[in-house]
Design a protein with these regions (language model features):
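Bacterial Sec-dependent N-terminal signal peptides
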Residues: 1-31
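Short aromatic-enriched loop/helix-cap "lid" or pocket-rim segments at secondary-structure transitions
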Residues: 51, 94, 173-176, 198-201
Length: 213
């Protein structure tokens, strides 16, 4: 395996720890709280790493080398019976609000405000679901209102950063903007699912969202 590919991942916890330490020195604090780095990965199966999310390794686990995930599991806690929804928005809405899809009722991916994204079916009626996503404030129809764990962390002194895909709420709703959820810095997160580029510093999507800059 190309060791160069592992190097940036290995640096992530180190960089975060260093930034926190520098901040503590500048402010004179002796903060013992841990840094929290949370990765949300789309379309990743439970056998897609060298770390088995089961009682034993499978053949597919042997196809990968993910030593940093193995190290995280040894040093932390691993859940072997924690399940995500089968599509992006429902999983992300569950993560940010701490509720499952049966409660927040975001059961498909979201994009345009007040627009369902379901395929039309002559035999089946589309159920009424929260196609505008989730929010921390009321006032938008077909939206689940919940408290963000990020907001709780921010209110308790954490510096919060979002980087990458967001997909919490439809366009022109409060929930589309990661800042709404308590993130002080947002890099590329917005209402659409994918990013146009991971290389630029602004204009990460086909639409010019002011909160991406």
């Amino acid at each position: 395996m190309n060791k160069k590919k592992l190097f940036p991942l290995a640096l992530v916890p180190l960089a975060a720890t260093s930034l926190q330490a520098q901040s503590n020195i500048q402010t004179g604090r002796t903060d013992k709280r841990p840094n929290i780095i949370l990765f949300m990965v789309d379309d990743m199966g439970w056998q897609d790493t060298s770390l088995p999310f089961w009682t034993q390794k499978t053949h597919y686990n042997e196809l990968y080398e993910t030593p940093n995930m193995e190290r995280l599991a040894r040093q932390g806690m691993m859940f072997t019976q924690a399940y995500a929804s089968s599509i992006s928005s429902p999983t992300r809405c569950s993560l940010i609000t701490g509720t499952n899809a049966a409660r927040h009722r975001v059961t498909n991916w979201t994009l345009q405000k007040n627009t369902m994204t379901d395929r039309k079916n002559k035999q089946l009626a589309v159920p009424d679901w929260n196609y505008n996503g989730v929010s921390q404030v009321p006032g938008t129809n077909n939206t689940f209102v919940g408290t963000s764990f990020v907001q709780i962390l921010k209110d308790n002194g954490y510096h919060t950063i979002h980087c990458g895909k967001a997909h919490f709420g439809s366009i022109d709703t409060p929930g589309e903007d990661p800042h709404h959820w308590g993130f002080e810095v947002n890099i590329a997160g917005h209402a659409a699912g994918g990013l146009a580029s991971y290389l630029g510093e602004e204009n990460y999507g086909p639409v010019s969202y002011t909160h991406l800059r």
